[in-house]
Amino acid sequence: MCSSGQISESEQLQLLEKLEVVRISGRDKRGRKVLRIIGRYFPSRLVTAEALKKYLEVKIFPKLSRKPFTVVYLHTGVQRSDNFPGISSLRSVYDAIPANVKDNLQAVYFVHPGLQARLFLATFGRFLFSGGLYGKLKYISRLDYLWEHIRRHEVEIPEFVTDHDEDLEDRPMMDYGIESDHPRAHTAIMDSPVSTYSMRCIS
């Protein structure tokens, strides 16, 4: 297993920039900026909470401090062992968000949550986040529902997300964890920049 201690903080920051885990991309239908987060791209084995906080402080928060914005979080394909930073790290990152940025956040669109994510947030959501933020969370099971709120052609959506969305249309029970993901979803993981970097680190 790779550990974050094997790469410096500057390398961690460069990795976050390269993978575009967190990026301001497009606007919603009210003209507000959209902060897009791709959960599957977050290399939790390589990047510490401190490095993530520094990246957000330098690259993201200054762009969100003055006007309202929304978040689109793509949970598609997230693996707990590879992409989940841990409860304490999530809380630490949330606590580091400046008050004016929290106030400007209007909605969090949680795309492809799945049963486990819903249960996790139902159990720990109010512990991790303030009631105000938790109340802004909106589950989005299909991309078509996202486009009711977000300008479709302004927010870049990775191909593996659209592929998974098509699978859900054909096999809706996947939403509830009753069916496993389509094999092509697993194949796509090997093509992601996270996997490439991780395999390089392991070797």
Residues of each region from the PLM?
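Basic, amphipathic alpha-helical/coil surface patches used to engage anionic, phosphate-bearing ligands
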Residues: 1-203
